[in-house]
Regions:
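Glycine-rich phosphate-binding/hydrolytic loop that grips phosphoryl groups
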Residues: 1, 130, 134, 183-186
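Glycine-rich phosphate-binding loop plus the immediately following alpha-helix
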Residues: 1-10, 18-89
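A general structural motif
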Residues: 14-16, 151
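Conserved beta-strand segments of alpha/beta enzyme cores
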Residues: 18, 178-180
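Glycine-rich beta-strand-to-loop/alpha-helix junction loops that act as flexible
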Residues: 22-25, 152-162
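A short glycine/serine-rich beta->alpha loop
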Residues: 37-39, 123, 181-186
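A contiguous, well-structured pocket-lining segment that forms one wall/lid of small-molecule binding clefts
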Residues: 59-60, 66-153, 164-177
């Protein structure tokens, strides 16, 4: 139902548009001219970011992505996270907190010799947040590049659209596309 709703709001007769909805998980709707919309989950959206942020800052979410933006992405951790089998599945596919949850996060960190407790080094905690943000951005970008490389616009809705760091990272991954929050579309 969501891709059809997105089609009615944002569909165009002359160009392909992608709507990325970033809530706990991220999903996209691919809106092609004269074709039925295609929608599927990409992977984690805010769920891992919010869980990690709350554990280390006491805040329910990373306001504007400022805390995560102060960290450094660990590329080796990111490559490992992207090896999660879900990312290789073809659409239509669905995921949720049954996969991308605190247990997944703990196991991922442990595989890199990191702790997930609040006693973690403050810089390491920011680096984890930055890496998780990059994971969400790359999961969305990979899905778009693979299934809608001709898209001209990526319209972002959901809570993730309020995370400036996440929006910046998505735009960096998709330089040939205009990435903007849905409120910019009216």
């Amino acid at each position: 139902l969501v891709p059809a709703f997105h089609q009615s709001l944002f569909g165009h007769s002359d160009k392909t548009v992608v709507v990325a909805n970033i809530g706990g998980m991220s999903n996209i709707s691919i809106l092609r001219p004269a074709q039925a919309p295609l929608g599927f989950d990409c992977g984690p959206g805010n769920a891992l970011l919010d869980a990690w942020c709350e554990l280390h800052t006491g805040q329910a979410f990373d306001v504007n992505g400022e805390w995560g933006a102060s960290g450094e992405v660990h590329e080796d951790w990111l490559v490992d996270a992207l090896s999660e089998p879900f990312f290789a599945l073809p659409p239509p596919k669905s995921t949720g907190r049954d996969l991308f949850n605190r247990d997944w996060l703990s196991n991922w960190l442990a595989s890199h010799g990191q702790t997930d407790g609040p006693q973690a080094d403050p810089q390491q905690a920011r680096d984890v947040q930055a890496t998780l943000c990059e994971l969400s951005a790359r999961a969305i970008a990979m899905a778009i590049e693979q299934h809608a490389p001709q898209a001209s616009d990526v319209i972002v809705c959901g809570g993730g659209a309020l995370n400036a760091d996440l929006m910046r990272r998505i735009a960096e991954q998709l330089p040939s596309m205009a990435v903007a929050p849905s409120d910019a579309w009216g």
